[in-house]
C-alpha cells in the first residue's frame, strides 16, 4: 500500500450538529442533503450525519436550562434500537426509520 495514495481526501460530508445542534428536523436534513447532492457530490462530498438527540422528544426545547435534555422520552423498536423522534422526523412513523 502506498502511503501517498491511501486516502486522497478525508471523509467529506455534512453533520447536523454543526449548525442545528440538537434541534434538527427532517425538512432541514432533506434540504441540506439535496443541496449537497446537487452541488458538492462531484467534489467528493458523500456523507450525511444526523447527530445527537435525533431520537429525543423535545430536543433543544429547553435551551435556557440545558443543551441536552436528560432523560427525554425515547422510542425503540422490538430490538431496542432507537427510533427517530416522530415529531421532528414524520416519515419515520411506524418504524420506517430515516426515509
Segments from the language model and where they lie:
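Extracytoplasmic/periplasmic, Sec-exported soluble proteins
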Residues: 21-28, 90-94
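Mature N-terminal, pre-catalytic/accessory segment of carbohydrate-active enzymes
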Residues: 1-26
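Aromatic-lined carbohydrate-binding/catalytic grooves of carbohydrate-active enzymes
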Residues: 32, 36-99
Amino acid at each position: 500500500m502506498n502511503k501517498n495514495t491511501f486516502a486522497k481526501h478525508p471523509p467529506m460530508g455534512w453533520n447536523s450538529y454543526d449548525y442545528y445542534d440538537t434541534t434538527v428536523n427532517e425538512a432541514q436534513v432533506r434540504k441540506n442533503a439535496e443541496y449537497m447532492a446537487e452541488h458538492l457530490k462531484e467534489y467528493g462530498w458523500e456523507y450525511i450525519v444526523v447527530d445527537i438527540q435525533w431520537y429525543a422528544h423535545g430536543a433543544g426545547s429547553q435551551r435556557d436550562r440545558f443543551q441536552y435534555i436528560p432523560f427525554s422520552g425515547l422510542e425503540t423498536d422490538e430490538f431496542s434500537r432507537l427510533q427517530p423522534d416522530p415529531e421532528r422526523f414524520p416519515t419515520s412513523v411506524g418504524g420506517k426509520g430515516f426515509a
